[in-house]
């Protein structure tokens, strides 16, 4: 059995997994929508989205747009629609999402629609990208990206603790940068889907 967490972190993870307060089943429908709004606000904020929490709530619950960039509103709407869709599929319809390339590409397409070209939405990038604030350069060769992504998706199965699996996928997909844009949003969504699969309350990253 492989671990990311140290002994103390494993104990905390076990506490979370066993706590009834961490279960999605304990949330009402209205609370789930509130959770989605909070998740989308913080996920967008990490990306530099300029919407405040109040503006985000008005946009996602009431359809009221702020006088800000179209891309900011589109980012939040895409995140919200994807998050709610996954919650309904897993929580309400009692399904489990398989974390594979097909799911990853579908989630990226849902998150990036209208923000990148149709040819790049839901497809691996064929151009080099950079991560600001670091000297690390993600692989730029398509075959190398495919190979490393395959390794990540294969290796996830060595983690039996869903919280460790969520962290592993989040960090490694974000580092690989398999898409032209929206990599961190997609990795946070995958992280949340892993937790949803275990009917866990997914807090903002």
Regions found by a protein language model. Name each.
Residues 1-203:
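FIC/Doc superfamily catalytic core
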């Amino acid at each position: 059995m492989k671990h990311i967490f140290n002994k103390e972190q494993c104990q905390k993870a076990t506490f979370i997994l066993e706590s009834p307060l961490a279960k999605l089943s304990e949330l009402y429908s209205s609370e789930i929508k509130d959770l989605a709004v909070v998740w989308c606000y913080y996920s967008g904020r990490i990306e530099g989205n300029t919407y405040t929490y109040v503006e985000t709530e008005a946009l996602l619950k009431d359809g009221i747009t702020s006088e800000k960039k179209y891309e900011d509103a589109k980012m939040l709407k895409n995140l919200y629609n994807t998050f709610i869709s996954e919650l309904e599929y897993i929580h309400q319809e009692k399904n489990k999402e398989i974390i594979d390339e097909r799911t990853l590409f579908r989630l990226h397409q849902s998150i990036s629609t209208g923000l990148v070209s149709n040819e790049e939405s839901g497809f691996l990038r064929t151009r080099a990208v950079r991560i600001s604030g670091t000297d690390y350069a993600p692989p730029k060769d398509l075959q190398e990206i495919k190979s490393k992504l395959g390794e990540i998706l294969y290796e996830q199965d060595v983690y039996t603790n869903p919280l460790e699996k969520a962290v592993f996928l989040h960090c490694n997909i974000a580092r690989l940068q398999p898409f032209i844009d929206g990599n961190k949003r997609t990795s946070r969504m995958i992280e949340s889907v892993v937790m949803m699969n275990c009917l866990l309350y997914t807090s903002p990253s």
